[in-house]
Design a protein with these regions (language model features):
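Amphipathic alpha-helical repeat scaffolds
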Residues: 25-28, 51, 55, 228-229
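Amphipathic alpha-helical segments within well-ordered protein domains
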Residues: 54, 110, 173-176, 228
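Long, acidic, intrinsically disordered low-complexity segments
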Residues: 1-6, 46, 52, 112, ...
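Extended ligand-binding clefts on enzyme/binding-domain cores
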Residues: 14, 43-46, 124-127, 131-133, ...
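Short coil/turn linking the two alpha-helices of tandem helical-hairpin repeats
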Residues: 113-117, 176, 180-183
Length: 252
């Protein structure tokens, strides 16, 4: 199956789930029998894109395939809660460990629960998801920042990406929501996550000198909108933030 053809929106057709079904079929066509979903058909897989694709399957009603995607993910989780950065044909091809990759599983799981209400599936993977969150926040510095990865020598990289950090912040929010949904009784865990969330949120709100130390990323639009969708800012602040930056990236 080939990629869906480009098409323009007409009237309200994009609000009908049928409009998106070809996307779901394409993701299914890319998924391996074991559940892996590469970023490109027959290409490499990274865990963040894999989770995004799994969420696409959930949205379009392919619940068993989505579960298979989560199962692949947890079957390939490292003992420290992380995932390696890239796979191909279920083999590791990039052995660093990106911190926002591990956290993002909670976004996928909360999304799956919101649609399916399958709390048993969430509960069966909760310990592994909690371990994934802890992998990232274990690396948090006193200023709130979290290294973007552990390199192949198992050392923290000395840079902190605003995009990755924004993703981690949203993932922590979803983790705490799942904690309450599952009625987890480990209050120490929740307090630790709340502390990490607040420290990271403060860093994202006051980013000067903290992020993207090795290379300027001001020309990348995602570095401007990721902090907005992370939840670090209020609605009013977000609108003001967008007004100040939209002319740099918006093309009429």
């Amino acid at each position: 199956m080939s990629l869906p053809k480009n098409k323009s929106f007409k009237n309200d057709e994009y609000s009908n789930i049928k409009f998106y079904q070809p996307i779901g079929l394409y993701i299914l066509d890319c998924q391996s029998p074991l559940g892996a979903i590469p970023s490109l058909k027959n290409g490499k897989l990274d865990p963040w894109d894999h989770i995004e694709s799994t969420m696409g399957l959930t949205t379009l009603g392919h619940y068993d395939a989505a579960k298979l995607g989560f199962n692949w993910l947890f079957n390939n989780q490292n003992s420290d809660g992380s995932w390696f950065s890239e796979f191909k044909n279920d083999q590791v091809i990039q052995a660093n460990k990106q911190t926002h990759f591990s956290c993002y599983v909670t976004v996928g799981l909360l999304h799956f629960f919101k649609i399916t209400k399958d709390i048993d599936f969430i509960r069966s993977n909760w310990q592994k998801a909690s371990k994934a969150i802890n992998f990232s926040i274990n690396l948090q510095n006193t200023n709130g920042t979290i290294p973007w990865c552990i390199n192949e020598d198992n050392l923290p990289d000395e840079d902190y990406l605003i995009t990755a950090s924004s993703s981690i912040l949203k993932s922590l929010e979803c983790a705490m929501a799942l904690f309450n949904i599952l009625e987890d009784k480990d209050k120490a865990k929740l307090e630790r996550w709340e502390f990490a969330y607040n420290k990271l949120r403060q860093a994202i709100r006051n980013p000067d000198g903290l992020f993207d130390l090795k290379i300027s990323r001001k020309r990348f639009s995602m570095d401007w909108y990721y902090p907005v969708i992370s939840g670090a800012f209020s609605t009013f602040e977000s609108k003001d933030f967008i007004k100040k930056t939209i002319n740099k990236f918006y093309i009429d």
